[in-house]
Amino acid sequence: RGGGRGGPRGGGRGRGPGRGRGFNQESADDENAFGSNNGFSGRYRVQEDGESGKLSERRGGYGGPRGGFHGGRRGGFNNGDAAEGEGERPRRVFDRRSGTGRGNEYIKREGSGRGNWGTPADDIAQETEVPVNDGEKIVEAEKEAGQEEAEDTNKDSTAAEPEEKEPEEKEMTLEEYEKLMEEKRKALLALKPEERKVNLDKELESMQLLSNKKNDDEIFIKLGSEKEKRKEAVEKARKTQSINEFLKPAEGENYSRRGGRGRGPGRGRGGFGGGVGGNKSFSAPSIEDVGQFPSLVAK
């Protein structure tokens, strides 16, 4: 195999301890292995024409299993195909076959199924059926065209007949027209239902009609006004209650104004004299004072 692990793959001197035999370990007489092998790596040199065929059969081409045309990993151009240009991919010989070996090229299913082209018998059957179908279609098309022409002629003849018959204008005098109108009126009067007449009995004749002086509207208006008056009286009774009980302060409490922001040191509510529940106290207002409660004066 090629040189040792320490050296580069392909032709050249192996410098490290490697498995197998290096090229320079085998022949010490070769001064330049790259020149003597003409750039080809491996144990075998390029031999003469007679021996080159044997080497290509054994190794599969110019290169061995390791060390290709320019020191590649695997053999260069196998199957006897020479390189037209450097670096080109070799042509694959069996392109028609599946590379994986898992294809279904041998399963034909007698020409049917997916991926099959059918059988030659199918092509023959189609060729024989096509002209028959074409002939039948042509005959059917001619029949349909003849039927349409016959229908068109029938329609033209039927359309021409009513045009020839024009409606006759009826003429009448004024007297005849008035007679027709009178007959129509009489017929309408006969259709109208007769008015029903009430038969007055003796009891109905003895009765008298009494007119009610009070209309219904007036009654409803009076009822509404009475309800409103009652509501007003109840509201007045509630208002007349004294509110002294609500204005009296509880025991131990003094009314005071709420303090504003203090101006001294200590921001926030309640300064030097502005806290809630200050020293100043106010008495409850008296309801009897006319100046404070002018609306409670007896009218």
Curated annotation (Swiss-Prot):
Induction entry: Stronger levels in light.
Keywords in alphabetical order: Cytoplasm, Nucleus, RNA-binding, Translation regulation
SMART domains: HABP4_PAI-RBP1 (SM01233)
Residue ranges of the region described as Disordered: 1-173, 232-299
Localization per record: Nucleus; Cytoplasm, Perinuclear region
Superkingdom in the source lineage: Eukaryota
Residue ranges with Basic and acidic residues bias: 45-60, 86-98, 134-146
Alphabetical GO biological process terms: regulation of translation; response to light stimulus
GO cellular component: cytoplasm; nucleus; perinuclear region of cytoplasm
Expressed in which tissues: Expressed in seedlings but not in roots.
Primary site of residence: nucleus
Sequence ranges of Gly residues compositional bias: 1-21, 61-78, 267-278
Entry GO MF terms: RNA binding
Motif (Arginine-rich RNA-binding motif E-R-P-R-R-X-[F/Y]-[E/D]-R-R-S): 88-98
PANTHER family associated with the record: HYALURONIC ACID-BINDING PROTEIN 4 (PTHR12299), PLASMINOGEN ACTIVATOR INHIBITOR 1 RNA-BINDING PROTEIN-LIKE ISOFORM X1 (PTHR12299:SF57)
Its job: Ribosome-binding protein that acts as a regulator of mRNA translation by promoting ribosome inactivation. Binds RNA.
Family statement: Belongs to the SERBP1-HABP4 family.
Name used for this protein in its record: RGG repeats nuclear RNA binding protein A
